[in-house]
Amino acid sequence: MNEMLSRFVNEALSCLIIVPATVLCLLPMKDKMRYSIKNVLPLFLGVLVMVTVIVSGATALLPVEPKVVFYILLVPLFLAYRVIVDADIVKCFATFLLSFTIMSFCKNYAIMIDAVIHPELGTPTFSTDGALIQLGISCAVTAAIAYPVAKYGSHLINGLPYRRVWLISIVMSLMFIGFNFTVQPVHYQTLYLNRVFLVYILITTLMFIMLVLMYTVFYFIASASLKAGKDKEHISVLEMQKKQYDAQQKYLEDTSRIRHDFKHSSLL
């Protein structure tokens, strides 16, 4: 009974990672919110409680892995996200996946610390310490990147309409999520074989740096594409105005010639 309660509490704490993940989802959508935060908060809390209870209860009572249940429950989470933001579904999915990509890196770093504190344990179940550490790392990372995500992310959300560009972002996020879940050790003791722990730290850190660099490059390429589109539109407007100006000039010249001919014929 105590073990079951412990698993329930640990999974409930692990599910709280949804809070910083949701913040990262909403920051770039700050100009696309259908409702105010005051109206969104009850929906968010309701979904959070539902996911927490279902994942924790299923993990404690059934012989299933928590991440399987959690993945299934990402569907209602995404649907709730779609309800509260007014943006293209591809943009929503790209932002949603990027948020959980960052959270998956936070989980890997929490696993490293948990493996030091409790080397006898392993995934997918965190210790209470590990769950709290994961939440702390996730909140710290969210706070650190909140400003650039809100400023530059919203710039792309508001101005970049090209679906293909957002699909590239989705593919990138899926690659990193796949990596993070592939390298997570089933038993922490595996990390203490030879230099596995060091390799785990290095490869996770390198992949996180790669994530930051790739999305930085993605931002500049997308911004350049957006600027090129605006420049092309501006040039089209200028060409249209030039055609109108030329037409008006021709009309004035023709009118002036007609008036001159009429005046000349009247004098005769």
Kindly give the residue locations of the regions a language model identified.
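Hydrophobic alpha-helical transmembrane segments
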Residues: 196-205
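Juxtamembrane or sensor-core-proximal signal-transducing alpha helices
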Residues: 145-158, 179-191, 207-236
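Juxtamembrane segments at transmembrane-helix boundaries
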Residues: 15, 19-41, 53-174, 179-188
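Membrane-interface micro-motifs in multi-pass membrane enzymes
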Residues: 10-15, 262
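Conserved phosphoacceptor histidine of two-component systems
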Residues: 253-267
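Short, strongly hydrophobic alpha-helical membrane anchors
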Residues: 1-9
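Cytosolic juxtamembrane regulatory segments of multi-pass membrane proteins
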Residues: 169-176, 236-256
